[in-house]
């Protein structure tokens, strides 16, 4: 018994491409006779043939007016049948301009997807320029303002400042593989407190080499040259000029996909080195106790449960080796660390992008007098596009910092931030940011709480010229005496881009 929605072809073998309306009788009111399909009945007339021809024409007309039928179960949809033979050129045009119909899990033709409205790129965003197979986006930032506490210590007077910065982003435009590099450099001059002048240079690069469709090689590296925070707990209160430090490193590894399961293995090396600090009396404070090299490896297993969402589990181990076997107090500060975390990545373009994870970390120190450091591990970087005009960013970071404070093995630092960007107009963007951080010193009752709140406006005059104004307030509250401070920073700036 044929299905209700299957084409029912007419019995005329000379024109089999014609069909009648599903469920309709072949020739209403006429019964088959012994004459077959000769067209003549028993009285030698052509009435039977004429009736069949009329029924066929009615069926063709009705079939052409049938709406498309989409099955939600196992029934198959009636496919349109061309009533006239197409030319070869017409068939080629139809094959080129018509996408094949998608099938659902039952084999039925799935409904057409809803065509979303095209979203135009930022009309005030930088376009960059092409150099061979690379796209370059340079920028220059000139700003100035006032900082009420550049030293981030109690009792430090305020000062006006100027800042000059430059950036260059390089992105490959290859059909396979990928390479990105970001260079950022700046220098701040304090007019009334020159000892707090500070450089800041950051270089980051990452590359992906597509070995096969399933296997990729991953390489990344970074370099940072900057001045230490004047309020660093590792520095004494009589530091006249914050020390400079270098932090550099990189990782290399590979990623392989087994269908939906992705395995990523990385190994890396990180290096941190400090210069001497200058004290108020002109003497130098040796900070080589803080210099160390870290070796580590990590393994991640991710499984794509649905397009754009990949839960994962990740674990890693590392070893920190200091340049000096013992510090100035005769203490060995080498340590081993391990962590494990679970999380998920989001790649829902235009809706939610980023990663969030939670777990636990631990550091075991070679010095038996030091307590092991253990704590929760929270890391995230999420961007949520709430509306076409509003974007929400959430960030969390957990790290273990080295310490040279007597009796302290290390400091567990946790930082959280939320930023809201809203476009009042396409050329006027408002930004509000809230942040909180805590430093817990293992082996000491000291706990530092850090807060930040800021707000600003960006006026996009053209794609190449942006003006900005912002205000930021920072303050620290600690249970240790003499370290609390508050800082208010006002900034006006001009940004030139390409």
Residue ranges and their predicted role:
Residues 1-498:
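Gram-negative and organellar
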């Amino acid at each position: 018994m044929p299905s209700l929605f299957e084409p029912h072809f007419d019995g005329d073998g000379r024109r089999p491409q014609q069909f009648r309306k599903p469920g309709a009788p072949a020739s209403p009111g006429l019964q088959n006779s012994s004459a077959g399909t000769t067209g003549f009945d028993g009285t030698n007339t052509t009435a039977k043939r004429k009736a069949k021809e009329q029924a066929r024409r009615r069926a063709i007309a009705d079939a052409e007016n049938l709406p498309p039928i989409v099955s939600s179960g196992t029934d198959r949809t009636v496919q349109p049948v061309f009533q006239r033979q197409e030319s070869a050129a017409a068939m080629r045009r139809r094959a080129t301009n018509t996408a094949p119909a998608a099938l659902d899990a039952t084999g039925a033709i799935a409904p057409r997807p809803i065509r979303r409205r095209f979203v135009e790129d930022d009309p005030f965003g930088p376009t960059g320029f092409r150099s061979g197979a690379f796209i370059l986006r340079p920028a220059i930032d000139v700003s100035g303002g006032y900082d009420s506490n550049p030293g981030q210590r109690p009792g430090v007077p305020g000062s006006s400042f100027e800042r000059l910065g430059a950036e260059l982003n390089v992105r490959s435009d290859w059909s396979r593989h990928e390479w990105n590099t970001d260079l950022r450099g700046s220098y701040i001059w304090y007019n009334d407190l020159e000892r707090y002048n500070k450089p800041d240079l950051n270089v980051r690069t990452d590359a992906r080499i597509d070995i096969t469709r399933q296997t990729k090689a991953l390489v990344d590296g970074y370099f940072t040259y900057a001045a230490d925070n004047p309020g660093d707990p590792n520095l004494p209160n009589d530091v006249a000029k914050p020390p400079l430090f270098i932090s550099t490193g990189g990782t290399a590894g590979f990623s392989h996909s087994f269908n939906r399961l992705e395995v990523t293995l990385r190994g890396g090396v990180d290096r941190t080195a400090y210069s001497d600090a200058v004290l108020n009396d002109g003497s130098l404070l040796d900070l080589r106790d803080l210099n160390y090299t870290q070796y580590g490896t990590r393994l991640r297993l991710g499984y794509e449960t649905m397009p754009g969402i990949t839960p994962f589990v990740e674990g890693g181990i590392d070893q920190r080796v200091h340049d000096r076997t013992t510090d100035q107090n005769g203490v060995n500060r080498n340590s081993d660390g391990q962590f494990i975390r679970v999380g998920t990545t989001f790649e829902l373009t235009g809706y939610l992008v980023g990663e969030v994870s939670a777990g636990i970390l631990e550091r075991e120190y070679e010095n038996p007098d030091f307590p092991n450091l253990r704590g929760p591990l929270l890391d995230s970087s999420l961007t949520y596009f709430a509306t076409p005009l509003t974007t929400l960013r959430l960030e969390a970071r957990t790290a273990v910092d080295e310490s040279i404070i007597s009796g302290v093995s290390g400091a567990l630092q946790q930082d959280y931030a939320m930023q809201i960007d809203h476009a009042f107009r396409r050329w006027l963007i408002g930004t509000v940011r809230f942040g909180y951080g805590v430093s817990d010193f293992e082996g000491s009752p000291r706990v530092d709480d850090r807060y930040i709140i800021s707000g600003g406006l960006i006026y996009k005059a053209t794609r190449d010229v942006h003006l900005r104004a912002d205000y930021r307030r920072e303050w620290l509250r600690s249970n240790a005496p003499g370290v609390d401070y508050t800082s208010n920073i006002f900034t006006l700036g001009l940004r030139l881009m390409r």
